[in-house]
Amino acid sequence: MASSSNEKEINYLADETNVRILGRTYFHNNILWMIYLSSGIEFNISANKLYISIKGDSAANVESSEGQISLARIIVNVNGERKLDELILHQDQTFKIFDEQNIIEGVVQVIKISEVAHSIAGIKSITVNSNGKISPTQPKQHRIEFIGDSITCGYGIEDLNPLNKFTTKTEDCTKAYAYKTATALNADFNLVSISGWGVISGFTPDPNVKNEIKLIPKYYIKLGFCNNSFEGKCVQDIDWNFEKFVPDVIVINLGTNDNSYCNGDKTKIEEFVNEYTKFLNVVKDKNPNAYIFCSLGIMGDQLYSGIENAVKKYKEANKVENISLVHFDTQLEEDGIAANKHPSEKTNEKAAKKLIEEIKNKMKW
């Protein structure tokens, strides 16, 4: 429903009456909070004017983006063309998307393209002229969930200098393999990915020191994990409702960060295999009808044999066949290396091509 109106404009809430919800989000106090990457809204529009009002999280209180590495980054696409690309600096910001003499018709998409751990942002309202209209778009043909780390996030993908470090300014999930795969397959999708996270250990510079905080399995059943709060709430304290998104396919791309800890140690690798198998059981429990693809390789495939063993154990224990492996090619310097030695968009295009073929083959899409 519309939240308010007058002679000149109508303000709509970002709820399911007016828009289609994308990704893991949370509606609270009439604000739709965009949690993981690529979460947000999509809607049909017929209007002369469009403004989007955004609410920042607890860290959105800066005068400039200079020196900031964790600000939420949002984009607005109109008929597939990026019309807005902004970092959220303040608690309340309103952005003009267009204000024209002629009516604009088509599809609008508002999504967050930076990752949850660093920041989230909320959609307060969608404003159009008094005779403007919006409505939810139709769901896509298929549904995919991607579970991963920085590679899935599009970490540093806009910065082709491998010596540079992380900032949300150069992170863009729309240029990474997961987004490209889902788009090519006409699929709605959820991204459950955080940079530096793993199965038994997040990234660690010292293989003798286990990073037990940054574990995807620990927070998979939660809304997410964020260092900031929103309206006095913490993302990691809220359970995710798995009925909100029921995927046909789940792609898991974890193990790159675990390798920094395992470092070829057989005992550690055995622990990785066991915990990966346990996580597969959790994923199956929450998504009983999904086909699972377990992948690795873009930034190294040292734990690929461990994932093979985990999949074998999972299949034997559950007497199922709806799971398979995808061995990605390791990135090449000639394709460009992005910030902090992460894959370029060209590398992601190659990975997407391979994954698309695998999914089409198994799912007959």
Give the ranges of each region predicted by the language model.
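N-terminal secretory targeting modules
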Residues: M1-I147, I151-C173
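Conserved SGNH/GDSL esterase-like catalytic core that processes O-acyl groups on lipids
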Residues: Y36, L163-K266, I298-E308, H342
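Short, conserved loop/helix-junction motifs that constitute active-site signature segments
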Residues: P139, F245, K284-N287
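Structural recognition of the beta-strand scaffold that forms the well-ordered cores
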Residues: R143-I147, T152, F189-S193, D248-N253, ...
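A structural motif corresponding to the C-terminal end of an alpha-helix
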Residues: A178-D188, V282-Y291, Y314-V320
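Aromatic/hydrophobic pocket-lining residues that form the small-molecule binding cavity
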Residues: F272, Y276, N348
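Catalytic His-Asp segment of secreted/periplasmic serine-dependent ester chemistry enzymes
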Residues: I298-W365
